[in-house]
Amino acid sequence: MSERYSFSLTTFSPSGKLVQIEYALAAVSGGQPSIGIKATNGVVLAVDKKQQSFLYDTSSLSKIERVTDNIGMVFSGMTADYRLLLKQARKVAQRYFLVYKESIPCTMLVQDVAKVMQEYTQQG
């Protein structure tokens, strides 16, 4: 029965669930854990980076990236989604810096990246 409701990102099944969101959560649940700790003088970001195959070059798999001098991103989930969001975050941060000559506030950057995520959730 859920197949009838899985075609649309915004169509609820009779049980009140968004089937596409459940599919996405199932896909992401297989990701490696990541953690961020805020301290008084900085932050610590850590990820569990397991080699999936001996064919992978683990030095080329980075789950922590710098967005600006004072903002970093970490992910656990779909690599392609992360790359798109990282690229968007860097563009927004650069635009902000070109206009205001200072680093973008973290909350503003988070809001902009969240908008991108929301658009993809609603449009597919």
Task: Please state what every model-predicted region is.
Residues 1-124:
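Long, low-complexity N-terminal extensions
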